Amino acid sequence: MPKMKTKTAAKKRFKITGTGKVKAAAAGKRHGMIKRSNKFIRDARGTMVLADADAKIVKQFLPNGL
C-alpha cells in the first residue's frame, strides 16, 4: 500500500499540538471588521483550538502529524 500523502492546504492552515489538539486561526476577519466589536477583533487575532469533531477530520489530512 502506498504512503499516505499530507494535504498541503491543511499543512499550511493547521498545527497539531503536543497533546494532539488542532490549532487554527480564528475565522471571520478578512473584511467587514468596522462593524465588529473590539472584543471580537481582539479575540480573532490569535489562534483557537478546534472542536473534537473538526479536529478528527483535519487529522485525516495530516497523517504525519505536521
Swiss-Prot record:
One of its GO terms (cellular component) is cytosolic large ribosomal subunit. GO terms for biological process: translation. InterPro entries: Ribosomal_bL35, Ribosomal_bL35-like, Ribosomal_bL35_CS, Ribosomal_bL35_sf. GO terms for molecular function: structural constituent of ribosome. Keywords: Ribonucleoprotein, Ribosomal protein. The keyword Ribosomal protein applies. It holds the Pfam family Ribosomal_L35p. Belongs to the bacterial ribosomal protein bL35 family. NCBIfam families: rpmI_bact. This is Large ribosomal subunit protein bL35. The lineage of its organism: Bacteria, Pseudomonadati, Pseudomonadota, Alphaproteobacteria, Hyphomicrobiales.
